[in-house]
């Protein structure tokens, strides 16, 4: 049987996430960076979450070639104890 009554329209509530407010673009392409240095800790900290995870490129807008370099640079900085592996020290 067909339903001829009014249908309830569902509203989509979007969650406000600070990573999605701005338009995504590659910071390294805009700055003309050729290679990401593991000693540039201020830049690397922008791409690491509080718990120590590397933020994925789909959230930051980083191009794939720079995301691979960023991944390697963060891992080198962690190995040399320039960056912590986690922020949760007990």
Swiss-Prot record:
The keyword RNA-binding belongs to this UniProt entry's keyword annotation: yes
GO cellular component terms, semicolon-separated: cytosolic small ribosomal subunit
Domain of life: Bacteria
GO process annotations (BP): translation
UniProt entry keywords in alphabetical sequence: Ribonucleoprotein, Ribosomal protein, RNA-binding, rRNA-binding
PROSITE patterns given in the database record: RIBOSOMAL_S18
Quaternary data: Part of the 30S ribosomal subunit. Forms a tight heterodimer with protein bS6.
Entry-linked PANTHER family: 30S RIBOSOMAL PROTEIN S18, SMALL RIBOSOMAL SUBUNIT PROTEIN BS18M
Family: Belongs to the bacterial ribosomal protein bS18 family.
The protein's name in its UniProt record: Small ribosomal subunit protein bS18
UniProt organism field: Bordetella pertussis (strain Tohama I / ATCC BAA-589 / NCTC 13251)
Gene name of the record: rpsR
